[in-house]
Amino acid sequence: MKKIPLGTTDITLSRMGLGTWAIGGGPAWNGDLDRQICIDTILEAHRCGINLIDTAPGYNFGNSEVIVGQALKKLPREQVVVETKCGIVWERKGSLFNKVGDRQLYKNLSPESIREEVAASLQRLGIDYIDIYMTHWQSVPPFFTPIAETVAVLNELKSEGKIRAIGAANVDADHIREYLQYGELDIIQAKYSILDRAMENELLPLCRDNGIVVQVYSPLEQGLLTGTITRDYVPGGARANKVWFQRENMLKVIDMLEQWQPLCARYQCTIPTLALAWILKQSDLISILSGATAPEQVRENVAALNINLSDADATLMREMAEALER
C-alpha cells in the first residue's frame, strides 16, 4: 500500500482510507447494517494495507465510532491511524445543522464542547488517544466560535497527548489560512470526485503550497459512480437531495459510465475502481477516503491503487465529466 507523510507529524497515511459513515447506519442510510459484517469490513481494510479509519460522532449519533472501536479491539493499535471529528453535536445546543430522523444536530466548535466531544469519542472508540482530530464543519452564527479559540483548544489536546494531529473538514481557502495563522494544520477533508471538481480551483493549490494532505470524501458520489445504480433507481435517505441524484443528472451520469467501458476493458478494472484511479492521478498529496460496507467492496476499492492511468485517458475522462455540465 502506497503511503504519504502527514504534514510535519511522524504519521504516514495509506493513500486510501476507509470511511465509515455508512457503517454507522441509521436514518441517513435507511437503517442499520449487520454489525459483524461492518467489523469484518474494517478488518479487511487493515488486511489490504489501509491504515486509516475515518469516523465521526455525527455518523448516527456515535454508532460509527462504537463499531470502529469494536474492530480496533482486534487490531494492533499502533498500526491504525484513527481519525474522528468534532463540531457536530446533539446533546448540547449550537447553530442548526441537519435533522436526522427525529433528532436535531447542531454545529458547535466552542472549547467546552470540543473537550466534551473528545472525551466521549475516546470512550466510544475504546482508545486513549486519537491520531487525527478534525473539525467536521466550520463554525457559523449564532453559536459562532472564532477559529483562534478552536485551534487553541486543539493545540492543548495535542500537548496533553489526547490527539496527535489536527485536521479540518469542509473548509474554504480563508479558513485554511486562518488555521495556519494560529497553529499547524496537517490535513483537510474536502468533497472531490470526477463529478465535483471545485476543490481544484483554490484548495488544492493552497494545500500543495503548505504541505497539507488533502483527504477527499465521496469520491464515488455516494455510490453513483459504482455503476450499480440503475435508471429506475429512486434516491432516498442521504442521497435524496443531492444534485447528481436528480433524475436528469443521474441518467446523464449513467450514460457516461457506459462510455467508460472501453477504459475498464483496457485497464481490466471496474467502473468504481476507474473513478478512484482518476482521483489518485490528480495529485500526490491526495488521500482517498472510500466508504465500504462489505469486505469485497474494500478489495475492489484498493485495486485502484494498482492502476497507472495514462494522461490521455485521465484527460478523456475529465472531458466526459465536463460535458455533463453543459
UniProtKB/Swiss-Prot annotation:
Enzyme Commission no: 1.1.1.-
Family: Belongs to the aldo/keto reductase family. Aldo/keto reductase 11 subfamily.
Uses in industry and biotechnology: Can be used in an engineered metabolic pathway for 1,2-propanediol and 1-propanol production. 1-propanol is a potential fuel substitute to petroleum.
Top-rank lineage group of the source organism: Bacteria
Gene that this sequence comes from: ydjG
Presence of keyword Protein biosynthesis: no
InterPro entries: AKR, AKR_Detox_Biosynth, NADP_OxRdtase_dom, NADP_OxRdtase_dom_sf
Protein name per its UniProtKB record: NADH-specific methylglyoxal reductase
